[in-house]
Amino acid sequence: MPLPKIEDARKLNDQELADEIVAVKKQLFDLRLQQGTGRLEKTHEIKHARHRLALLMTVERQRQLQAQ
């Protein structure tokens, strides 16, 4: 699975962006929980979730700065 693209995040509206950030944070929590209990087989999924979260938060911050 390739890493997500920033263009995909920029297409989301503000509410979808906020919902996606919450969903990725939950996914990251679940992945870390699985890693801690030794049940995580695809460890690269943590990297993908962190990358996606950073990407979404960057887009959110860019929109905040544009609104000022």
From Swiss-Prot:
TM helices/strands, residue ranges: none
One CC-aspect GO term: cytosolic large ribosomal subunit
Top-rank lineage group of the source organism: Bacteria
Alphabetical list of InterPro entries matching this protein: Ribosomal_protein_uL29, Ribosomal_uL29, Ribosomal_uL29_sf
Alphabetical GO biological process terms: translation
Gene Ontology molecular-function annotations: structural constituent of ribosome
Keyword tags: Ribonucleoprotein, Ribosomal protein
Matching Gene3D superfamilies: 1.10.287.310
A family per Pfam: Ribosomal_L29
Family statement: Belongs to the universal ribosomal protein uL29 family.
Entry protein name: Large ribosomal subunit protein uL29
